[in-house]
Amino acid sequence: MSVIRLHQYQVVGRALPTEKDEQPKIYRMKLWATNEVLAKSKFWYYLRRQKKVKKSNGQMLAINEIFEKNPTTIKNFGIWLRYQSRTGYHNMYKEYRDTTLNGAVEQMYTEMASRHRVRFPCIQIIKTATVPASLCKRESTKQFHNSKIKFPLVFRKVRPPTRKLKTTFKANKPNLFM
């Protein structure tokens, strides 16, 4: 399995100052990309579509990577997104359990690619939030909220107790059925 390794960036930019507008409006965007170059590219793509500001007439003020405050605790993340499919544009809400928001976004991208055949450029993340357990909607995230959850060992392979009893070739195939 290949890992995407997405990072969350905060990109700040604006249109170049002109005689007509000496203090142009500053735009800040949080987005996910594999590196800073792609984050800048995505920023100018969205700014060109929404605010009619092109990179040639624009100015990049700052680009910072955003890190998770508690990357060791498991949280529920809600992701609101918009994606383009063969039939048009669709809005969607997804829930994931992960230790970081970047991990949840990676899960979302892989799930959208597998279930809906929607690739990275066709997905626009509208909003993300940490969702408390009481407000979770999806059954796939709710099932892990039980404190007495158990995971059965389905693939039990009996191993020899000592190395002396280990053989290279077996007379019969081992039965792994429980």
Curated annotation (Swiss-Prot):
Keyword Ribosomal protein part of the UniProt annotation: yes
GO biological process: translation
Record keywords: Ribonucleoprotein, Ribosomal protein
Domain of life: Eukaryota
Ranges in coiled-coil conformation: none
Gene Ontology, cellular component aspect: cytosolic large ribosomal subunit; nucleus; plasmodesma
Keyword 4Fe-4S appears in the UniProt entry: no
InterPro entries: Ribosomal_eL20 (IPR028877), Ribosomal_eL20_dom (IPR023573), Ribosomal_eL20_eukaryotes (IPR021138)
Gene3D superfamilies: 3.10.20.10
GO molecular function, one term: mRNA binding
Family membership: Belongs to the eukaryotic ribosomal protein eL20 family.
Annotated protein name in UniProt: Large ribosomal subunit protein eL20w
Organism phylogeny: Eukaryota, Viridiplantae, Streptophyta, Embryophyta, Tracheophyta
